[in-house]
A protein has these predicted regions:
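Conserved AMP-binding/adenylate-forming
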Residues: 26-31, 45-92, 213-214
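Adenylate-forming
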Residues: 6-10, 36, 40-43, 58, ...
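Conserved AMP-binding A3 loop
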Residues: 29-34, 168-192
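N-lobe entry segment of adenylate-forming
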Residues: 1-31, 35-49, 54, 122-128, ...
């Protein structure tokens, strides 16, 4: 997906809109597929510099931050396994997930109490090596925004690049009746959601689609990433915490 769709669209239509993002402070950002190609390459190179390699597990707790899309596609290019997670998790949730999946690194929002919960959980999570903060700073954490931007915007496909049956991502189930279970998906997974986007969401080429979901939920990947971009449409992302009737 990262090479065959994102990079290919960037080559074919460099100025094609991929995402319209509105932050909590109402800052508007427009990202083309060329932007996604370049920023995801920076991410792939950055993760590689940290010793993250094909098959390693990386958790993403990034709410609706635009950096999620950069990191997600970067991990796809590198072949590391992305594990999206919600910022509603607390210490014991993180500890269980870190150890069950063998998480090597986490990218975490600086918002709220989430990074503190990760710090507590990390004391009992021997596989976790890198804690990377996004949209802020924290003692003992790497600064994603400062560090990844120093890397090259070029990341080439190789004979060992991920594809087909290689693992793309992992979700944890809700754990309603027991401990959450891992649901793993391979690199064919995005193709299945072309139908989701085209026939359920009615996405169109050059259209703009809104899915409210936080990136920690499975809905975000089939509602605001894979299927929509396969339809060659853009996604609209509003990085909010709570909808207020008084705000416009």
């Amino acid at each position: 997906f990262a090479f065959d769709l994102v990079d290919a669209l960037a080559e074919r239509e460099p100025d094609k809109l991929a995402m319209l993002h509105i932050s909590k402070d109402k800052t508007e950002r427009r990202f083309t597929f060329t932007d996604i190609k370049k920023e995801s390459a920076r991410c792939a190179n950055y993760f590689k510099s940290l010793g993250i390699k094909k098959g390693d597990r990386v958790m993403l707790v990034l709410k609706r931050h635009y950096q999620f899309w950069f990191a997600m596609i970067g991990l796809n290019k590198l072949g590391a396994v992305a594990i999206p997670a919600t910022n509603q998790l607390v210490e014991h949730d993180f500890e269980y997930r870190f150890n069950a999946a063998g998480v090597k690194a986490i990218l975490c929002t600086a918002d709220g109490d989430t990074a503190h919960q990760v710090d507590i959980a990390s004391k009992n999570s021997p596989t976790l090596i890198h804690k990377i903060i996004v949209n802020g700073t924290r003692e003992g954490w790497r600064n994603f925004d400062e560090e990844y931007s120093l890397f090259s915007t070029h990341f080439k496909r190789t004979a060992d690049s991920p594809c087909g049956d290689d693992t793309l991502l992992m979700f944890f189930t809700s754990g309603t009746t027991g401990y959450p279970k891992i649901a793993a998906h391979n690199h064919k997974y995005p193709l299945g959601h072309f139908h989701t986007a085209k026939y359920w969401h009615c996405c169109e080429r050059d259209g703009l689609h809104l899915t409210i979901s936080d990136t920690g939920w499975g809905k975000s990947l089939w509602g605001k990433l894979y299927g929509q971009w396969l339809c060659e449409g853009a996604v609209f992302v509003y990085d909010f915490d709570k909808i207020s009737k008084s705000k416009k």
